[in-house]
């Protein structure tokens, strides 16, 4: 490895600092591999009970939708950035992220823009309605038609579009649906996507508008507070 530093007159050299960082080798130089079995702090039976309870809340009319999840943990050795690189290759998405905070790292991928603000307008792109890609154009066409006519998928989509409208209405005026149930194709799935947008009110601001849309309805359910 050869390092060359080009400096203008009066600039402070940093070549030694760079050499020190390289020689410290404070990064994993070996491949990534898992250690032991994955586990979750929530057992299968507990999670099934949560699902049954969620169904009862829906049947009673307490909520329209509940989004249940549980965390899985997996010990590993190696460079986790390799997992992120594999994710980019296996599941390319419009939004990929990798944050290194020193003591922990967060990475993932998503097709969804939760909330975008530009030139005084805020928009939310609800995604609800999903079918797997088959690799065959004709099969994908049939799955798209099935998706567009599925009562459950359409009901969920309508709910999330209305939720986006409600969230934006807190801080926006002239809220509208820019496009509705647009079919979008990704590497592994077919999605139904809509866009709801509005003009930020003079007495509000982008930060408040953005914060008041959290959490995403696709992650919380609806009504948000009751569902969570």
Q: What spans do the regions from the language model cover?
A:
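Extended alpha-helical targeting/anchoring segments
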Residues: 1-228
